[in-house]
From Swiss-Prot:
Keywords: NAD, Transferase. Removes the 2'-phosphate from RNA via an intermediate in which the phosphate is ADP-ribosylated by NAD followed by a presumed transesterification to release the RNA and generate ADP-ribose 1''-2''-cyclic phosphate (APPR>P). May function as an ADP-ribosylase. This is Probable RNA 2'-phosphotransferase. HAMAP family: KptA.
Length: 194
């Protein structure tokens, strides 16, 4: 196996990242894990809960996944004792307080064409999550949309929304968040070349 020091094979890193995302965003109770309102969980409790499910995760591997995750999904506390998902929570326990931020003129949302009729009628809604997630660039939005089917990119007139009283937040990993995006602020972009 040709992996660099402190690097996991891609399938292992992906599996661990997905497990952490599920537990820290959506279902901490499945392993008896307690999250505080800002989403922090004790690392030792997380590792013990995962072990009770018959899976092995040690601190060094956890730290490697956090440090090398391409989407920077996780944050470790300064003292190294706690971990949290940066954004994307659906569990009602977590009510992160992000500072309000001035958005760029345009933001982007990647989705699948099968969702367009609903989006045209209702705009973007957070669904089970606490916020609508927006990307600062087209490339990231395209990658997100591809995960759900035939992708389409929606351009968000973020500055106009902001001027009309909508609040934006930006998570530590650069993902922009807002409560909803009414359809009047959305524009479908031309389909990317395949």
């Amino acid at each position: 196996m040709n992996t660099k020091k402190n690097e996991l094979p891609a399938p292992d890193a992906t599996r661990i990242s997905r497990t952490l995302s599920y537990l820290l965003r959506h279902a901490p109770q499945t392993i008896g894990l307690q999250l505080d309102p800002e989403g922090w969980a004790d690392i030792d409790e997380l590792i013990a809960g995962i072990a009770r499910q018959g899976l092995h995760l040690d601190r060094a591997t956890l730290e490697t996944v956090c440090a090398t995750n391409d989407k920077q999904r996780f944050a470790l506390s300064d003292d190294g004792r706690r971990i949290r998902a940066v954004q994307g929570h659906s569990t009602p326990v977590v009510q992160r307080r992000y500072p309000a931020a001035q958005p760029p003129e345009r933001l982007y949302h990647g989705t699948a064409t099968r969702f367009l009729d609903s989006i045209r009628a209702q705009g973007l809604k957070p669904g089970a999550r606490h916020h609508v997630h927006l990307s600062p660039d087209i490339r990231t939005a395209l990658a997100v949309g591809t995960r759900y089917g035939v992708p389409v990119i929606l351009e968000v007139d973020a500055q106009r929304m902001h001027r009309q009283g909508h609040t934006f937040f930006v998570a530590e990993n650069g993902v922009w968040l807002t409560d909803t995006v009414p359809a009047e602020f959305l524009k479908e972009m031309d389909q990317p070349a395949r």
